[in-house]
Amino acid sequence: MTTSTMQQLKHDGDFSDELNETSTIQFYNKVSQQRKRRKTRTTFSNCQLNELENNFNRQRYLTPTDRDRIAKHLGLTNTQVITWFQNRRAKLKREAEELERDVMALRKQKQQKFTCLSLSDHDHEETQIDDENEQGDNNNDDDGDDNDVEEDDGEEQEKNHTKYLTQPPSISNILPSSLKHFPSSTLNTLEIDNKHETLNMNLFINPFSNEKCLKRNKDLIRQQCYLFNHHINNYCTVNNDNNINNNNNNNNRKNSIDGMNKGRSIKKGNKIWCPALELEQEIH
């Protein structure tokens, strides 16, 4: 290959590169011209925007007659009205999507809060169970202490029982509930009369034999009840005699008055109630 042919090929390659550069420059020039040919953005007045918004709220899509009417009323072209409605529908769609995303985000936040609260409640329940178990262990220890205390109480009760067996009860302790209104002076005299006898009887009681003590106390209780009833009967008979005398005097006085008024005598039954024995006796 000669030098002339090599130079020729080199010249052809340079020429092809120049052609490529010129073609790219022309392409960019065409694009820039097209950009320059774009129409300027139309500006709407406040009155036009308010009217377009009112029409959009009434109907999203316009019929040809409505489009012509709005264009004539606002002094706009049909294409301007169409583009405005298209842009407004696109804007409404974007707002709806954003609102839906916000709602989903709020729901996720609420779910996260709910899960956190449920986990905290579960942990709280576990801590309560642990506390209850600890309290149960403490209660078991306390039960052991209570058993010791109950044993001590049982020993004290046994001591009191032996003490009761060695000491006979007084008359005031064996007094029936129906005789609580009985005069206290009489009860005091009964206790004074029986004190000497009970003291003498206690001398023969053996505090170390429970059966003998119990039998002896029963005998003492019978004797005290007998003495107590004897004094009550004496007290009631005295009161009955006094009441009978008073009633006879009243009856005689009444019969004399009735005899003077009516010329005849009337016998009437009178009832006397003894508060100690709760008995009624009828006197004719």
From Swiss-Prot:
Domain of life: Eukaryota
Localization of this protein: Nucleus
DNA-binding residues: 37-96
Principal cellular location given in the protein's record: nucleus
Pfam families, alphabetized: Homeodomain (PF00046)
Annotated InterPro entries: HD, Homeobox_CS, Homeobox_TF, Homeodomain-like_sf
Name of the molecule in the record: Homeobox protein SMOX-5
Organism expressing this protein natively: Schistosoma mansoni
Gene name in the database record: SMOX-5
